[in-house]
């Protein structure tokens, strides 16, 4: 999927780029049975207070129900009926029609086309888009949509252009290298999908103007030093100031390199190498 640029007829178009959507199926509305309404929370929690800042507005969306698991469809072939846009994630999605007639959405891997036949299960062919247990995938293969707990569905590597690589297999665990540089042990019975995720040009898109951020539901980010003392530890002062202390969050937590991960987290034993700085 390529990048589309615009002639600078207005100032806002000068730096704006968008995806061309050439790889998507034409004229396909999302399948009604696989969508549901999505109420926009504007960053509020159940009590109505802001729990996530800088959220609000944005275009209406319908949530697409994605099958991250594919376990209950082992050994049932499925045909790719369409590749569609999903406003709720950076990756595109593919509509699968199984041999038994059921339809499901999955994250669209890079390189699949309408009409391809995909399969899941321990005996599925080693082919892009097929989902297998990690123990059945050859070393050196790129994978995505990786389970961390058997039966829970894929949790790792689900965004556009993402992939991980199988480095080794020893005993009950497989060593996987993530795109962040982290090397991690994952139980061999967990399933993953072969190949990279498509829509890799998503990272190269330039928003170009503030209005597009608002369409996406993103509100402005205000600097702490521009606030009042009641709103932020960096706020206040006469004239422009530097904040007067080391950088902290609005709640006083040190930032800019301060580690917040618990020192005795249960998953530490599965991490061989931490991610790159």
UniProtKB/Swiss-Prot annotation:
<feature type="region of interest" description="Disordered">
    <location>
        <begin position="32"/>
        <end position="58"/>
    </location>
</feature>
<dbReference type="InterPro" id="IPR005880">
    <property type="entry name" value="Ribosomal_uL2_bac/org-type"/>
</dbReference>
<comment type="function">
    <text>One of the primary rRNA binding proteins. Required for association of the 30S and 50S subunits to form the 70S ribosome, for tRNA binding and peptide bond formation. It has been suggested to have peptidyltransferase activity; this is somewhat controversial. Makes several contacts with the 16S rRNA in the 70S ribosome.</text>
</comment>
<feature type="region of interest" description="Disordered">
    <location>
        <begin position="225"/>
        <end position="277"/>
    </location>
</feature>
<dbReference type="GO" id="GO:0016740">
    <property type="term" value="F:transferase activity"/>
</dbReference>
<keyword id="KW-0687">Ribonucleoprotein</keyword>
<dbReference type="InterPro" id="IPR008991">
    <property type="entry name" value="Translation_prot_SH3-like_sf"/>
</dbReference>
<keyword id="KW-0694">RNA-binding</keyword>
<dbReference type="Pfam" id="PF00181">
    <property type="entry name" value="Ribosomal_L2"/>
</dbReference>
<dbReference type="GO" id="GO:0019843">
    <property type="term" value="F:rRNA binding"/>
</dbReference>
<comment type="subunit">
    <text>Part of the 50S ribosomal subunit. Forms a bridge to the 30S subunit in the 70S ribosome.</text>
</comment>
<dbReference type="InterPro" id="IPR022666">
    <property type="entry name" value="Ribosomal_uL2_RNA-bd_dom"/>
</dbReference>
<dbReference type="InterPro" id="IPR014726">
    <property type="entry name" value="Ribosomal_uL2_dom3"/>
</dbReference>
<dbReference type="InterPro" id="IPR022671">
    <property type="entry name" value="Ribosomal_uL2_CS"/>
</dbReference>
<keyword id="KW-0689">Ribosomal protein</keyword>
<dbReference type="GO" id="GO:0015934">
    <property type="term" value="C:large ribosomal subunit"/>
</dbReference>
<dbReference type="InterPro" id="IPR014722">
    <property type="entry name" value="Rib_uL2_dom2"/>
</dbReference>
<dbReference type="GO" id="GO:0002181">
    <property type="term" value="P:cytoplasmic translation"/>
</dbReference>
<comment type="similarity">
    <text>Belongs to the universal ribosomal protein uL2 family.</text>
</comment>
<dbReference type="GO" id="GO:0003735">
    <property type="term" value="F:structural constituent of ribosome"/>
</dbReference>
<dbReference type="InterPro" id="IPR022669">
    <property type="entry name" value="Ribosomal_uL2_C"/>
</dbReference>
<dbReference type="Pfam" id="PF03947">
    <property type="entry name" value="Ribosomal_L2_C"/>
</dbReference>
<feature type="compositionally biased region" description="Basic residues">
    <location>
        <begin position="258"/>
        <end position="277"/>
    </location>
</feature>
<dbReference type="InterPro" id="IPR012340">
    <property type="entry name" value="NA-bd_OB-fold"/>
</dbReference>
<protein>
    <recommendedName>
        <fullName>Large ribosomal subunit protein uL2</fullName>
    </recommendedName>
</protein>
<keyword id="KW-0699">rRNA-binding</keyword>
<dbReference type="InterPro" id="IPR002171">
    <property type="entry name" value="Ribosomal_uL2"/>
</dbReference>
């Amino acid at each position: 999927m390529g990048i589309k640029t615009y002639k600078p007829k207005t100032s806002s178009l000068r730096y704006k780029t968008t995806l061309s959507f050439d790889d998507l199926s034409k004229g396909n509305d999302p399948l009604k049975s696989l969508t549901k309404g999505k109420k926009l929370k504007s960053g509020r929690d159940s009590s109505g207070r802001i729990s996530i800042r800088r959220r609000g507005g944005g275009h209406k969306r319908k949530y697409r129900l994605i099958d991250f698991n594919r376990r209950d469809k082992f050994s049932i072939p499925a045909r790719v009926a369409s590749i569609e846009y999903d406003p709720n994630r950076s990756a595109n999605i593919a509509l699968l029609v199984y041999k038994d007639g059921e339809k499901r959405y999955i994250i669209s891997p890079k390189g699949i086309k309408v009409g391809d036949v995909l399969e899941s299960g321990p005996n599925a062919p080693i082919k892009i888009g097929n989902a297998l247990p990690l123990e059945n995938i050859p070393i050196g293969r790129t994978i995505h949509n990786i389970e961390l707990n058997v039966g829970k569905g894929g949790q790792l590597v689900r965004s556009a252009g993402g992939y991980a690589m199988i480095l080794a297999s020893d005993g009950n665990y497989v060593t996987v290298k993530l795109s962040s540089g982290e090397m991690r042990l994952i139980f061999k019975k967990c399933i993953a999908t072969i190949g990279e995720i498509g829509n890799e040009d998503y990272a190269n898109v330039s928003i170009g103007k503030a209005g597009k951020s608002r369409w996406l539901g993103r509100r402005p980010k205000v600097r702490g030093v521009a606030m009042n003392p009641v709103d932020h530890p960096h706020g206040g002062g006469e004239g422009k100031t530097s904040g007067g202390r080391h950088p902290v969050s609005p709640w006083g937590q040190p930032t800019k390199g301060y580690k917040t991960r618990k020192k005795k987290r249960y998953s530490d034993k599965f991490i061989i190498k931490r991610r790159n700085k």
